[in-house]
Amino acid sequence: MTRTQPLRMVLVASLALLLSFAWSSPGAAQASLPYWTEIAQGGVVPAPVWDGSSAYHQGRFYIFGGLNGTFPNDEPVAGFSAFDVDTLTWYDLGQYPGGPSARAEAMMWFVAEDDALIVSGGRGPFRRGLDLTHHDTFRFDPGHGWTEIPQSAAEIGRANRSTEAVAVREKGKHKTVAYAFSGSSSTLPAFVNRPDGLQHDLVRYKNGWKQVATGAPAPRARAHHPLVHAEEWNALIVYGGYTNDAVNGTGLFTPENYLGDLWKFDLDTETWEQLLFDEAGGPGHRDNAKLIADEQNGRIWLFGGSLYDGTTLSDVWYFDLHSATWTRVDTAMTGPAPSPRFGQFYFSRKTATAYELYIFGGATAEFAPVLLNDMWRLTIPFACCS
């Protein structure tokens, strides 16, 4: 069989001129604090969109789908693009036929050993009075394009969710598996309070979706929550999210619908542990936050999200695993910063000197927002905040 051309080579087949970063260096007094950099994007920059899917591998940032507006004009799209982090160049990959239909919040991850992407599940818009969820699963590689993966009835049921998925390389093996926790499984009105509106389990994709038997305790079912893999801890981290109203059973945008808990899933023992802290000193209840696992310093970083009253955030916090306390740092940061947003595409990575969070696009609010297609990088030096 002829060896397929690596996906990175496809992306750089027509190399653009190297672009420079548009950024401001932190001053000496700020050198150890995190700082934001706005990225000057080249190539075919995607149109403003939000609530799509993200994946990253070795300098390549992939995005798929999302919504191109807000209610009642929030139509899903099937846009497919890749950003080369080295050349700061976007490439449109929409020329490949047979891929997933237009959708938002699909699970997507990169399979390194196959140089391939997987897209699974997702949803259409809310507030249409219809169940517009998806439960199909697709594979993409540059040699074969898109291929739909056959699934059993049980796998179809587990794929019917809209949430984040993370890729994990199994210890001692050259095999990528993916994990996803909970997520929405309906777009019907008041879905969050319906018995079938949320998935309740942790699932693993390894030649198909399978349920992970985790036992108790376990986090409550939720949607719009971040999920991150901490490789050195061999753990998954979850914070907050949007859930059912356990007090009155009917609330949709009340404080009871938003969570502010922090959980760690040990991939070795397959058990959950809640990381307890004084909520009065933490980020509070929110959904749509983004997380970074700082294994270097024993911290979990959190960026942004949205509150029950519609407030969109751009704050930056870290949780110290040793002291079980939260510290807010954006109030001490200087220089340019992105506007508050949610539903942005993103990835994080570790470099030789820092952790980095890249964000692209998003919406400034759920109702009557501005849709964005700017890109920013948050740099968190290893020496930060010591």
Name these PLM-found stretches.
Residues 1-2, 30:
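Initiator methionine at the very start of the polypeptide chain
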Residues 2-11:
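Bacterial N-terminal signal peptides that target proteins for export
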Residues 16, 26-29:
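Cleavable N-terminal signal peptides
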